[in-house]
Amino acid sequence: MSTLRMRFLTLSLATAGLAAMAMAPTLSPQAAVVDAPASTLVTVATNPYPADSVLTGYTQRARWTINVLRDNRPALTACNHGNYEPDSGHSSDSYHYSGNAGDCYAGNTPGQYPGPIDKDQLQRAANFLVANAGPLKVQQVIWNGQIWTWPRRSEGWRTYTGGTGPVGGHYDHVHVSIARPGDGR
């Protein structure tokens, strides 16, 4: 590759990086610092978007939270909103239907139990979401046969009874629900 072409590519990448940084949400001086294990302790800005619903894709609020999660947990290989239909096996009030939920994976194959490395990465993602639930507007996290919810946060993780197996029991992915209209957040 020619020196001129390499300089052009370097300049193009630098310009794209600056543009992306300019468009990214910035941490405000009021950003929350959470009390959490060292593996999850970060400064997280408060989600700037209002509770909302959409017909396709993520709401702005959910997209922002998923982006913060993926920025802080780069081992996550995919976070899908699903746009699940009411007959997809989810409960009738699933946050997926309104664009306020995501399912995140760490390299493991959906539908199969993750190996120890992927399981560790998923556990770290779940811990991050719970530790930063206030500013991220997280309403619910389901992972590894357990559930954590904002309204019952003082109880910590509880047994999840909404499904079984790798998918239904949320052993192959971390589910995160973001507060929606009516949740009061």
Language model regions located:
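Generic preference for flexible, low-structure residues
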Residues: A24-P29, G145, S154-W157
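Short, low-order "capping/linker" segments at domain edges
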Residues: P151-T164
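Short, exposed beta-strand-loop hairpins at the edges of beta-sheets
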Residues: G163-G169, S177
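Secretory targeting and sorting signals
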Residues: M1-A31
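Secreted/periplasmic proteins that engage bacterial cell-wall peptidoglycan
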Residues: A36-S154, Y171, I178-D183
